[in-house]
């Protein structure tokens, strides 16, 4: 009996020899002279050290690689990113989905290229669970690329760094044919939810000027739980069970802007708390800061409270990283937006403003599918069939909407022509989530803190 148990457990145990974290992995280091390479150039490559994770078991796919890619930060300074390319069985080398995870962290060891590997730390559980969203893309036979778009400084919520990294990741993937067998002229669709939508949205908006040559490859972008104003998310989450998202965001912006970091440091007498903002992944960050007040209340971390946003330096940085303020940046590719009307983490008001900005600017194709009964958490699942249906239609050459179209449905499960297998897949996922003890009002983003603390063992 013990021998049989060993036979069952041994393969799993072998898989749990942990992958090396980015902070200790030389592959992530920029090689000498990398600055001379063009953006999007592959500097080195390797098979992923571990298989792609399915949380408890590896995902069975044909192959996966990591590419070290030349990119640049918000100021045009050269840097490198790692991107992960996944090849399913019976892959179609003419189709590539660029999936941006909601990393939502200011810590290097939370990078998707590490988190997507089987055996990665439990603190990366949010990214690990996102393989549930990746699976239908792979099942369609699409190659999938997922970049470490926050870059080597882990600049969570920094728009330009993120968008440029996504585009340079796509450039690299399209040049990787000798490694991956992906066609250089492959068609590409981008997809991201929440923090991943921020990166995807910035990529779509920057593409006409930053990567115009990709215009012939890109078929569109699906943006869910669309983050266009980081201040609004801070206001919505401060002092709530999701305050950790705000802490991670402050850490991410501080990683890119030293002057931002200095102003925050000078405004707190709780330096030990501030010093930990870049030391959490999404799940442990949320759990660690439940109910914490950073800019509100009598025991806030920053003495100036919300008045700190009136500081001209802070105000400019915040606006520079909010798509809602960038009226001059308008995508030229078709766009799908899906969002929950009762989202308590990313308020829909700024999504509507961005939608209107793009419509007023004459965007060629913008579809907005608004869900009346779901908030940020459950829309991750309920909105996914919308994105997948739209993506499949894009790859199959079906026509997108002409101009702007905004439709509000009771639930995005009602989106037209969702393939039954995809709809059933995500309905089952929603039922599992609701039954996991996070609270009876989870669809309204009202989460039981005790249930939230169980996240690592819920999945």
Swiss-Prot record:
InterPro entries: AB_hydrolase_fold, Lipase_secreted. The active site is at residues 194, 343, 376. It catalyses: a triacylglycerol + H2O = a diacylglycerol + a fatty acid + H(+). It is found in: Secreted. Glycans are attached at residues 229, 266. Its EC number is 3.1.1.3. Residues 1-14 form the signal peptide. One of its GO terms (cellular component) is extracellular region. It is an enzyme of class 3 (hydrolase). One of its GO terms (biological process) is lipid catabolic process. The keyword Chloroplast does not apply. The keyword Lipid metabolism applies. Disulfide bonds join 110-281, 359-404. One of its GO terms (molecular function) is lipase activity. Induction: Expression is induced in medium containing Tween 40 as the sole source of carbon. Expression is up-regulated during the yeast-to-hyphal transition. Expressed in host cecum and infected mucosal tissues (stomach, hard palate, esophagus and tongue). Expressed more strongly during mucosal infections than during systemic infections. Keywords: Disulfide bond, Glycoprotein, Hydrolase, Lipid degradation, Lipid metabolism, Secreted, Signal, Virulence. Secreted lipase that is able to hydrolyze both the neutral triacylglycerols and the monopalmitate ester Tween 40, allowing the use of hydrolyzed products as carbon sources. Has broad lipolytic activity, which may be important for colonization and subsequent infection, therefore contributing to the persistence and virulence in human tissue. PANTHER family: LIPASE 5, PTHR34853. Belongs to the AB hydrolase superfamily. Lipase family. Class Lip subfamily. This is Lipase 4.
